[in-house]
Amino acid sequence: MGKLFDKIRRVQDKTRPFCSAIVPAAGSSARMGGQDKLLTDLCGAPVLMRTLCAIDRTELVDEIIVATREELLLTVADLCGRCGLHKPVKVVRGGSTRAQSVLAAALEANPKAGLLAVHDAARPLVEKQFKAGLDTL
């Protein structure tokens, strides 16, 4: 029932811009010695899953766009499906740099997006800070 009220609140609040959360996740995890840090288990779930769930709980975000490496597109899409996210999620091919990944995701944002929030995929413990940052806008 809480999700229904969240949707009603969003419809009523027409002053808030549509927000697309961009999650760059195309890095090579070079400092991890070849182990992909985003898929590493953190207390029972991959780091990326925890990050996406935290963003999903943020009321001010309307959609999530994950930019990842080509070889991880299916893996990340499957992970997103297993997260039980409530917001629409897109998984897109990222670039060879963070800037290219952010651009690739931004180009896939909903045309209604008046705000793009970029958050690093490897930082799952963000919920309060992410929300506080968006609240100040």
Model-derived regions: residue spans:
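Structural motif
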Residues: 42, 67, 92-93, 119
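A short, basic/flexible loop-to-alpha-helix module at the beginning of a structural domain
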Residues: 3-15
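Short glycine-rich anion-binding loops that position phosphate/pyrophosphate groups of nucleotides
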Residues: 27-30, 70-72, 96-97, 121-124
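Acidic helix N-cap motif at the loop->helix transition within catalytic regions
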Residues: 74-79
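N-terminal glycine-rich phosphate-binding loop and ensuing alpha1 helix
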Residues: 16-70
